Amino acid sequence: MTQRTLHGTVLKKVRTSGFRSRMATKAGRRVINARRRKGRAKLTV
């Protein structure tokens, strides 16, 4: 049986690339605005 190699952690994902962590920094806010301009359905994870 093959082994699953990717074990994602939801909490870690949210802390690094969630909405509130994006809004906390200037660069993160730029990311959000760029995704809004592009018309992304999902801004963050």
Swiss-Prot record:
The cellular location(s) given in this protein's UniProt record come to: Plastid, Chloroplast
Q: Key word Chloroplast present in the record?
A: yes
Q: What's in the GO CC field? A: chloroplast; ribonucleoprotein complex; ribosome
Q: Which domain of life is it from?
A: Eukaryota
GO terms (BP aspect): translation
Instruction: Supply one GO molecular-function term.
Output: structural constituent of ribosome
Family from the record: Belongs to the bacterial ribosomal protein bL34 family.
Under NCBIfam families, the record lists: rpmH_bact
UniProt-recorded name of the protein:
Large ribosomal subunit protein bL34c
Q: Which gene encodes it?
A: rpl34
